[in-house]
């Protein structure tokens, strides 16, 4: 699993960098343009690789017929060919450690969702409080469990229970500014009319 995510991450970064090159979305001062070479999206093990070498890596990243194991083997071979094995191995080790940490945190968050959801339900069902007190209680719970509260609010919004963000960016499903309206308040799929 970690290798799959590692390969996908490397491939995504490389494709993003390739798209930002000449003819891509990077503009004249982006990677590959007339401005500084390289770019922030370049994996560290490719920084000192020639443009021709980067094209070889790119060919592997974009080859959808390779299995992940085959692609990883070819990437490691290219890293050796271009003398960046140590930097590549460090990148892989760092990415693997990061993915392990994410998996651990994800498991903890998933384990907390039921309890945090029950706490949110208790807060929202308490009618003996002001709206401000309710908001403060939710904020206090969010400070203790920020990811869990945001995940639950996101899930509720997907199910039509509440908005993810406040403000005047649209109402609940079917309400003013909700999904029955288009992206800018006009008819779905059409431009915003003259209001």
UniProtKB/Swiss-Prot annotation:
Q: Name one Pfam family in it.
A: ANIS5_cation-bd
Q: Where is the composition biased (Gly residues)?
A: 167-195
Q: Which family is this protein grouped under?
A: Belongs to the SXP/RAL-2 family.
The entry's protein name is SXP/RAL-2-like protein 2
Q: Which PANTHER family match?
A: PRION-LIKE- Q/N-RICH -DOMAIN-BEARING PROTEIN PROTEIN, PROTEIN CBG18492
At the top level, the lineage of the source is Eukaryota
Location of the region described as Disordered in the Swiss-Prot/TrEMBL record: 162-195
